[in-house]
Amino acid sequence: MAYERNVDSRQPPELHLISALLALESTGYLISLAKQCGGGVITEEIQRLLLNYCITIFSSSDFPNTLPIRNLAKSLINEVESSGGVVLDEIYELCSSLMTSPLESSGSKSQRVLKRYSFLFPDTTTLMIPLISSTNMLEGDTGCSVWPASLYLSEFILSFPKLFENKSCFEVIYS
């Protein structure tokens, strides 16, 4: 018997899946969350949810880097097919169009991605913070996006905004 439930991108676990997708988490993690949403398998409803977000969010991004979508589409097809499920035709079409289009050039615009970090509050408030990041490790950035303590600090600041009202934040640079 198939696992059936209503898919709502504003409620957990779908909300967690979409938040991870917007933050460009690894495909393995996204597949794991997608399976949680579907009760152990990636249902057609979850595939459609992922497809809609891939097309609407990443296709209209200010920094269109198709590599994350490409990797997710391939992993999604592989996972659904290996579990004996049915892959949506639209996902095959998306994957084939991404596979036949050339990779972005090495220009600076294509080497940037727009990650969106979501902070989810118990009162259903969601705060999304966009972060433009380089895909080139040699180009560098602050590193705060991958530093776990920065996430905890951000959550603390968002939980107690009065403590940080009219305060400034700066980065210490050692030379």
Question: Model features per residue range: what roles?
Answer:
Residues M1-S175:
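S-adenosylmethionine-dependent methyltransferases
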